[in-house]
Amino acid sequence: MSHSDFNMEPEYVSFSDKDTKSILNESKSSLKDVKPSLEEKSYITPGLVDDVEPKGKNFVVRFFDDFKPAKATGEDGTALKRSLKSRHMQMISIGGAIGTGLYVGSGSSLADGGPASVIINYSLIGIMMFFIVYALGEMAVAYPVAGGFNTYATRFIDPAWGFAVSWNYFINYFVTFPLELTTCAITFRYWTDINSAAWISIFLVVIIIVNLFGVRAYGEVEFILSTVKVVATFGFIILAIIINCGGVPTDHRGYIGGSIIKHKPFRHGFKGFCSVFTTAAFSFSGTEVIGLAAAEVDNPQKALPHAVKQVFWRIAIFYVVSLILIGLLISPDDPNLMGNGSTSVSPFVLAIKEANIKGLPSVFNAVIIISVVSVTNSSTYTAGRTLHGMANLKQAPSFFKYTDRLGRPLLAMIVVLLFGFFAYINEADKNGNDVSDTVFNWLLALSGLSNFFTWGSICLCHIIFRLAFKKQGHSLKELGFVSPMGIWGSCIGLFFNILCLMAQFYVSLFPIGGKPNANDFFQGYLAAPVTLAFFIGYKIYDRSHIPSLDKLDITTGLKTYENLDEEEDEPTTASKRIFKKISSVFC
């Protein structure tokens, strides 16, 4: 090649206006061809369903199109939409279990065991839940899958145990839905004697409408209801302090201080203490729902840890502080207290009434109704998602896997909503019969211990997961969220659940104020043999076995987050490191 070849003038290609227009038209045409493929890719985003609504269709057509099956699934094999935001999860975690267990159930606890038993036992169960929720949060961030903790039990413990626990958990919330509808109607009797069926119909329609709008509607409704409960409980705490100090002009008792709690701190001895221990555990039912919702949370690695850390404040403020104040204001011998007589009133409402504050008891009764509606809403969500998760694990009929274009597990949801009509059995009581109470008591007895089985399984799953994770050479740095209590926290949580089962057995066998009898025992402990029957039956059918730690599948669906904190500046002093560690647990 000669030197002159490097000095050649560059050649330019010229285009006419006609050629330019032709090229632009071809480019536009090729971009149109690319657009559908980009939309198709959005369908395979893990856990997401396409949000693009079809153009040119009216509302009615789109409404019916939404019921058609989802076009594609996420990598966990489901088509649930990740529509829950961090704010939803935080309010669900704070207000999720602030409901009838606190506002109503604490009354029977106070009557059975006295104020000291209430404060001690609710604090102990709160510590147990603290360990359980952190263990659940770690696994939910690592495996944000449909079915949540029920799926973990199948995977890490044994498929037969997962089957038994999942069905027990489903039955619990399946029955709770119509029961809470009935409770809504009964609560209105504080103001009016309107037929209960009318209130049941109103609330049933409301719950159906909420579920028609999918998981986002559930999240928004729970956000609003939980906000009301949180504000109301804060308001009660402030008011209760004022009442105790004698600051209410209409309260002629003056300064109360600790005079009531000193009079009779305990009731019914050890039996009363055990009774409150189990009642307190039931009051925290629903705390674990944040783990079940992991498959529908947008960015679970950020949303779930924040929600988990709120549990400490909910336990410390809303349960312990409010119940200490209830113990200071209400005598366990009060005949109006739930558990002491035929006329039963919530201890929160009773504390306000005894201070002779006009109008405010009705306001707090409205808060109790809101809390019952919240529990009803959560029950439909929990039961439907649990049934859908079991279908994905082949532990329930496969048609319950059906998910529509809005990410709703449609058939599972319909079955749960239809069972809500069972609440009308309350009408059978008009002739003086207690048909509804008898039926609901025995239906609840089938799954009465589901909380203990579920929480214990979460702890055991976390222990096995951690051991297998270490055995197979993985580092905790790979996880997006790590429980600061580790395996030992889960061991303590598991131990507490075993204690709860023992206490429930004792109280069922030797009921307060009565002699041992078959009716009381099986209403309190029937769930144990039922769960065992589920376990043995599935074990015979599936012949499943428990894999060893080194062969346990912990990689499928595992979300790892290596080098997650590399950009964060490490504290330079020991005091700052301690402060960071403490704040990371609670904030």
UniProtKB/Swiss-Prot annotation:
Q: Name one GO molecular function term.
A: amino acid transmembrane transporter activity
A GO biological-process term: L-lysine import across plasma membrane
Q: Which residues carry this modification: Phosphoserine?
A: S29, S30, S37
Main subcellular localisation: membrane
Q: What happens when the gene is disrupted?
A: Leads to a dramatic decrease in the uptake of arginine or lysine and resistance to canavanine and thialysine.
- Show the stretches that span the lipid bilayer: 91-111, 116-136, 159-179, 194-214, 223-243, 273-293, 311-331, 355-375, 406-426, 445-465, 492-512, 521-541
Q: Which residues lie on this side of the membrane: Cytoplasmic?
A: 1-90, 137-158, 215-222, 294-310, 376-405, 466-491, 542-580
Q: State the compartments where it is located.
A: Cell membrane; Cell tip
Annotated keywords: Amino-acid transport, Cell membrane, Membrane, Phosphoprotein, Transmembrane, Transmembrane helix, Transport
Which ranges does the record list as Extracellular topological domains? Answer: 112-115, 180-193, 244-272, 332-354, 427-444, 513-520
Q: How is this protein positioned relative to the membrane?
A: Multi-pass membrane protein
> Can you name a GO cellular component term?
cell division site
Superkingdom: Eukaryota
Which PANTHER family has this protein been placed in? AMINO ACID PERMEASE, GENERAL AMINO-ACID PERMEASE GAP1
What family is it from? Belongs to the amino acid-polyamine-organocation (APC) superfamily.
Q: What does this protein do?
A: Major permease specifically involved in arginine and lysine uptake.
Report what the protein is called: Cationic amino acid transporter 1
Which species is this UniProt entry from? Schizosaccharomyces pombe (strain 972 / ATCC 24843)
